[in-house]
């Protein structure tokens, strides 16, 4: 990854970029100039840039809800001309974009289907590095956390308006926070004094609320709460649930969709959906699949792939990633590749 240093890559080293390209490479190259790749989480454009470079005939559609990301990535990818198209949307707007979007690349996608797709889930490195967005808990900033800063509720809105039960649910469900109820009680007590506006006050509350023994062994006490608030603000699991059937419907035969998850709840959702799609609907006990019951997809990865030690050393943000890929098939074949 020598040519993708952080300093020369807009502050963002694309996680496992070579492996992401390898997972979709065979079919994309086979499709040639008919290949359309969807980078559904464009961010700084690192993965899209790599795809456009290593697949010189392919076209890329980049999706992002953040206008700033689209602008910066568009400038970065301008040298690829009409092989790249950026679209402002949450990634579960994919089906709408493919159905009604305008442009030669979208016309090609409607005609040929999607040959490869990447979903790099969670907050982008670029957003983490923008202090004013409020994603990071180590620097005081407004409690925003919106991936699209022009619409939707903020993290402050959640803390200042949600009930005790709803705050506890968010922290427990999306952050696996053991002390969700205790934190929710502290939030309600503190907001009676003054509404929450900045991250420093929330971090201070978490230090005061989470027991010292847990703080010593469980990592930064704000990590789980900030993660949970971000997921709620951006409706991340809802978006993921919505887009899974959208992308699998859009793949052409041989096309692959790759998902990079950084949290257990994301990976479990992807795993469950992939298992359902790759399981025969023939009743148990029959020797062959009945017509129309054979799976139309196969899992490409054996379980979830993880980043190598070398990758993590180069790019520490790759440490928690889990990668799963699925391929549309014409007829039933073996369920995983060797």
From Swiss-Prot:
It comes from Corynebacterium efficiens (strain DSM 44549 / YS-314 / AJ 12310 / JCM 11189 / NBRC 100395). The gene is rsmH. It comes from the Bacteria. One of its GO terms (biological process) is rRNA base methylation. GO terms for molecular function: rRNA (cytosine-N4-)-methyltransferase activity. Specifically methylates the N4 position of cytidine in position 1402 (C1402) of 16S rRNA. This is Ribosomal RNA small subunit methyltransferase H. PANTHER family: 12S RRNA N4-METHYLCYTIDINE METHYLTRANSFERASE, S-ADENOSYL-METHYLTRANSFERASE MRAW. It is an enzyme of class 2 (transferase). Keywords: Cytoplasm, Methyltransferase, rRNA processing, S-adenosyl-L-methionine, Transferase. S-adenosyl-L-methionine binds at residues 45-47, 64, 91, 120, 127. Belongs to the methyltransferase superfamily. RsmH family. One of its GO terms (cellular component) is cytoplasm. It catalyses: cytidine(1402) in 16S rRNA + S-adenosyl-L-methionine = N(4)-methylcytidine(1402) in 16S rRNA + S-adenosyl-L-homocysteine + H(+). It is found in: Cytoplasm. InterPro entries: RsmH, SAM-dep_MeTrfase_MraW_recog, SAM-dependent_MTases_sf. Its EC number is 2.1.1.199.
């Amino acid at each position: 990854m020598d040519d993708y240093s952080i300093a020369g890559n807009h502050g963002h080293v694309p996680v496992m970029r070579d492996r992401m390209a390898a997972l979709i490479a065979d079919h994309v190259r086979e499709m040639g100039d008919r290949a359309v790749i969807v980078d559904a989480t464009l961010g700084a454009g690192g993965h899209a840039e790599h795809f456009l470079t290593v697949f010189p005939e392919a076209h890329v559609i980049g999706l992002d809800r953040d206008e700033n990301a689209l602008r910066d990535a568009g400038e970065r990818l301008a040298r690829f001309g009409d092989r790249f198209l950026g679209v402002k949307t949450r990634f579960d707007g994919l089906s709408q974009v493919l159905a009604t979007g305008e442009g030669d690349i979208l016309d090609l996608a409607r005609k040929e289907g999607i040959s490869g797709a990447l979903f790099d889930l969670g907050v982008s490195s670029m957003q983490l590095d923008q202090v004013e967005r409020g994603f990071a808990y180590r620097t005081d900033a407004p409690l925003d956390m919106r991936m699209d800063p022009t619409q939707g509720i903020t993290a402050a809105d959640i803390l200042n308006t949600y009930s005790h039960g709803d705050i506890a649910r968010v922290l427990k469900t999306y952050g696996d926070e053991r002390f969700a109820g205790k934190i929710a009680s502290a939030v309600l007590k503190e907001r009676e004094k003054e509404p929450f506006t900045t991250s420093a006050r929330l971090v201070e509350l978490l230090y005061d609320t989470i027991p010292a023994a847990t703080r010593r062994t469980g990592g930064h006490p704000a990590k789980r709460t900030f993660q949970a608030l971000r997921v709620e603000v951006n409706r991340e699991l809802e978006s993921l649930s919505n887009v899974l059937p959208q992308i699998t419907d859009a793949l052409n035969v041989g096309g692959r969709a790759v998902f990079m998850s950084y949290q257990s709840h994301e990976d479990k959702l992807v795993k469950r959906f992939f298992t359902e799609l790759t399981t025969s609907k023939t009743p148990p006990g029959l020797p062959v699949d009945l017509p129309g019951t054979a799976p139309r997809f196969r899992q490409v990865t054996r379980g979830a792939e993880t980043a190598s030690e070398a990758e993590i050393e180069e790019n520490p943000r790759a440490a928690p990633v889990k990668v799963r890929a699925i391929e549309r098939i014409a007829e039933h074949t073996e369920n995983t590749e060797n």
